[in-house]
């Protein structure tokens, strides 16, 4: 079992509830599951434009699937590496991370994220994972000032990019625009890190680490991703590495399933882009089990497709290993979960297939662009006269931020990023369409 310091909460609690024998991480899971931010995921589409019927996944169903895969990974690692069972002592912890991992993502997917990042370009930027950290630690009203007040280890596990944005930002790589309609996502990629407004919580999370561990954990280097101008962090905690693998598997496999059912990805595209990788893999299991899996995936027999999806998920989950960094002192940082090389390559091929034929599909990009315009329009309107247009409770937060000399624009980003796709679209119509909405008496 890990040190008890990782079970501490930022705001001490002394709640004595009748016959409540839950562990700290079971309480964390309950707080996330019952939060308004989690419920809103049911109205945020996982992939814009695939919602033509009731089959498609939302961010909520995606998060549930990530949770199921994440606990499956932990279970098989516990059997494979009994010496590491102390690190895998709570399934509730991993469920918490997987359920919460998308909570901070704004309406309209990447389009909404880029739009908010642009509108916040002079006020600390915006990025979905940073917003998740902020919701859990400050915004969700489980407590007055400490958000959900989750355990320190839970907060460590949600840190996909453990460094303040200001330490990662590289200036001079952005293109100012004269009109919102000219905004290109490739020119305004978000800095992947924690908002500087939340450095106090970030410092608290990392408090138990030695100086050497903290310096290394928060270090960054130039990204290997083409055309990404900012620095990228290099390390994640053990729990975060499991959550991220579960997210990647769900994205690559389950989003692919949606695309196949909708007819967005075809059998010929599979044969061209994926089948050769499986057929010529250096791993015998991939060659034997996955070489002809496309036949089942694109079958009109529903049960055959589901069997193929299950085979893919099982293959990736059981190919995950624990690696030893050998440098970090803290076990939660020293050990990480990762995929065997051939399976990592196979998963990346599936992710690229989804990106190429689904995410980059012009019809889907048009919807993302439309969402981008909605978010920028809303932000511009609220920023022009916050005390006139914001809801009363958000006005109060904005005024308090102004009075304390804090970043009041962050309050606008908090409000808009919490909207669902439908609510944001409806609000945009109320503000900008010519039709009078006679909702007053």
From Swiss-Prot:
Highest rank taxon of the organism: Bacteria
Domain HD: 59-252
A biological process from GO: dGTP catabolic process
Gene Ontology terms, MF aspect: dGTPase activity
Region (Disordered): 1-27
Listed Basic and acidic residues bias regions: 7-27
SUPFAM superfamilies: HD-domain/PDEase-like
Recorded coiled-coil stretches: none
Keyword Hydrolase: yes
Keywords: Hydrolase
Name of a matching Pfam family: HD_assoc
Family: Belongs to the dGTPase family. Type 2 subfamily.
Database matches in NCBIfam families: antiphage_dGTPase, dGTP_triPase, PRK05318.1
Name of the protein in its database record: Deoxyguanosinetriphosphate triphosphohydrolase-like protein
Organism from which the protein derives: Shewanella oneidensis (strain ATCC 700550 / JCM 31522 / CIP 106686 / LMG 19005 / NCIMB 14063 / MR-1)
């Amino acid at each position: 079992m890990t040190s008890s310091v990782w079970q501490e909460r930022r705001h001490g609690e002394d709640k004595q509830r009748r016959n409540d024998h839950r562990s700290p991480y079971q309480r964390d899971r309950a707080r996330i599951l019952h939060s308004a931010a989690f419920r809103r995921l049911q109205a945020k589409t996982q992939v814009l434009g695939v919602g033509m019927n009731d089959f498609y996944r939302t961010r909520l169903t995606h998060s549930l699937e990530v949770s199921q895969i994440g606990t499956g990974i932990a279970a098989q690692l516990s059997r494979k590496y009994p010496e590491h069972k102390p690190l895998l002592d709570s399934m509730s912890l991993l469920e918490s991370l997987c359920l919460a991992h998308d909570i901070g993502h704004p309406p309209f997917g990447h389009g909404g994220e880029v739009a908010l990042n642009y509108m916040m370009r002079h006020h600390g930027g915006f990025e979905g994972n940073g917003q998740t950290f902020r919701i859990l630690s400050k915004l969700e009203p489980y407590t007055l000032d400490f958000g959900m007040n989750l355990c320190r280890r839970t907060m460590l596990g949600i840190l996909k990019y453990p460094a303040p944005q200001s330490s990662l930002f590289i200036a001079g790589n952005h293109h100012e625009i004269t009109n919102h309609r000219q905004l290109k996502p490739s020119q305004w990629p978000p800095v992947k890190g924690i908002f500087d407004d939340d450095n106090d919580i970030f410092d608290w999370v990392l408090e138990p680490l030695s100086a050497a561990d903290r310096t290394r954990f928060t270090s960054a280097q130039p990204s290997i991703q083409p055309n990404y101008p900012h620095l990228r962090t290099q390390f994640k905690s053990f729990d975060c590495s499991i959550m991220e693998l579960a997210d990647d598997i769900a994205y690559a496999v389950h989003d692919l399933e949606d695309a196949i059912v909708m007819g967005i990805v075809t059998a010929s595209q599979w044969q061209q882009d994926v089948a050769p990788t499986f057929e010529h893999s250096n791993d015998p299991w991939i060659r034997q089990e996955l070489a002809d899996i496309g036949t089942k995936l694109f079958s009109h027999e529903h049960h055959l497709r589901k069997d193929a999806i299950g085979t893919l998920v099982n293959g990736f989950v059981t190919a995950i290993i624990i690696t030893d960094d050998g440098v970090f002192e803290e076990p939660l940082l020293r050990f990480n979960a990762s995929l065997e090389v051939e399976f990592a390559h196979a998963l990346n091929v599936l992710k690229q297939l989804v990106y190429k034929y689904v995410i980059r599909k012009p019809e889907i990009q048009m919807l993302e662009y439309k969402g981008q315009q909605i978010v920028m329009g809303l932000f511009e309107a609220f920023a022009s006269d916050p005390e006139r247009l914001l809801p009363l409770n958000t006005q109060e937060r904005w005024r308090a931020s102004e009075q304390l000399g804090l970043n009041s624009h962050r309050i606008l980003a908090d409000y808009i990023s919490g909207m669902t796709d439908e609510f944001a679209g409806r609000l945009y119509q109320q503000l900008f369409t010519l039709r009078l909405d006679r909702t007053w008496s």
